[in-house]
Swiss-Prot record:
Keyword Methyltransferase: yes
Protein's name in the database: Ribosomal RNA large subunit methyltransferase F
One cellular component term from this protein's GO annotations in UniProt: cytoplasm
GO terms for MF: 23S rRNA (adenine(1618)-N(6))-methyltransferase activity
UniProt family annotation: Belongs to the methyltransferase superfamily. METTL16/RlmF family.
PANTHER family cross-referenced by the UniProt entry: RNA N6-ADENOSINE-METHYLTRANSFERASE METTL16 (PTHR13393:SF0), SAM-DEPENDENT METHYLTRANSFERASE (PTHR13393)
Catalytic activity, as annotated: adenosine(1618) in 23S rRNA + S-adenosyl-L-methionine = N(6)-methyladenosine(1618) in 23S rRNA + S-adenosyl-L-homocysteine + H(+)
Length: 308
């Protein structure tokens, strides 16, 4: 039960295989979703979306003190270890300027989602304060319900509705507001058909019947946008220029390595002073995020000093 997962960040709490007994003690409903693998080991029925949701609920309660968490049907149920990795690598990036991870960082989560996952982890692990933007009323209501149901979160997490679905930072970052970083898990498909095909592949890989009533979810704004991930991030890069003095680091996940070259070109054209790529791995899954800033070393130090 102690096999280490390759590639996770050293501070990630999910280095080892899940202690299912402990998780079931924290969240008893998980017990009904346990199965035996062909090798005879106890596991979670990952082909069942309700089981995945129960596992997430248990992980968030056990490791992050989130006692009440739920999402409506049809929304993305995020893998907690991978989301935690982004937060920990972002903490390392923020710590590079001064040599220590900031305890009072303010973070903007672009597309906070119904699950509110990044703020939940970031508040618990580092005491950061989050603003979460969202275009979907249903997702925003879900995230707000999670915040209100857990003591102390309303002081650390605030949500803002993005009224213009074509905008990313505009309308969310207010005048005289400053952020240490933005983060984002962008939509990666370029059409609804591509998103459906991706969901079908995931179901087949997990042995789930196509006609199952439940699937792994994902609303339009979570899964696809015109032009796909590259177009979305290029839009983000273009908009980031307007807020170049209000944000220290802009960051976003990039799902595929082949998407990086056009993004690097866009960053050069936008005048980014420094661009960083952070590679991550969760088991067999490789992922990465890119970060860019319009501030030089001295400017970044002054920004941090002034903001503190």
């Amino acid at each position: 039960m102690s096999a280490q997962k390759p590639g996770l960040h050293p501070r990630n709490r999910h280095q080892h295989r899940y202690d299912l007994a402990a998780l079931c003690q924290t969240t008893p409903e998980l017990t009904s979703f346990l199965i035996r693998t062909p090798a005879g080991e106890q596991s979670v029925d990952f082909a069942n979306p309700q089981a995945v949701k129960a596992l997430n609920k248990a992980l968030l309660a056990h490791f992050y003190a989130v006692t009440h968490w739920d999402i409506p049907p049809g929304f993305l149920c995020p893998p907690v270890p991978g989301r935690a990795d982004y937060i920990h690598h972002l903490a390392d990036l923020l710590g590079e300027t001064t040599g220590s991870i900031p305890a009072q960082a303010t973070i903007l989560d672009v597309g906070v989602g119904a699950n509110c996952i990044y703020p939940l982890i970031g508040v618990h692990e580092y005491g950061w304060r989050f603003t979460g933007s969202e275009v979907s009323d249903a997702a925003m209501s879900s995230a707000q319900a999670i915040i209100q149901a857990n003591t102390g979160l309303s002081r650390a997490i605030r949500l803002r509705r993005q009224k213009d679905p074509a905008a990313i930072f505009t309308g969310i970052i207010h005048k005289n507001e400053f952020y240490d970083a933005t983060l984002c898990n962008p939509p990666f498909h370029d059409s609804a058909a591509a998103a459906r095909a991706g969901s079908e592949r995931k179901r087949r890989n997990l042995g789930q019947n196509k006609d199952d009533a439940l699937n792994f979810g994902g609303q339009q704004q979570e899964l696809w946008c015109e032009g796909g991930e590259v177009a979305f991030i290029k839009k983000m890069i273009a908009e980031s220029q307007t807020f170049r003095r209000q944000v220290l680091w802009f960051t976003t996940l990039v799902s595929r390595g082949e998407n990086l070259p056009p993004l690097y070109r866009a960053l050069t054209e936008a005048g980014a002073v420094k661009v960083v790529k952070k590679e991550m791995a969760q088991g067999q899954k490789q992922s990465r995020f890119i970060a860019w800033t319009f501030m030089g070393d001295d400017q970044r130090r002054r920004f941090i000093t002034r903001k503190r």
